[in-house]
Amino acid sequence: ALAGDHFFRF
């Protein structure tokens, strides 16, 4: 999804 989705999944 977004550029930070890989660590902002929560």
UniProtKB/Swiss-Prot annotation:
GO cellular component: extracellular region
UniProt key word Ligase: no
Superkingdom of this protein's organism: Eukaryota
Subcellular location: Secreted
GO terms, biological process: neuropeptide signaling pathway
Keywords annotated in UniProt: Amidation, Neuropeptide, Secreted
Main location class: secreted
Modified residues (Phenylalanine amide): F10
Family label: Belongs to the FARP (FMRFamide related peptide) family.
Descriptive protein name: FMRFamide-like neuropeptide ALAGDHFFRF-amide
Species, as recorded: Mytilus edulis (Blue mussel)
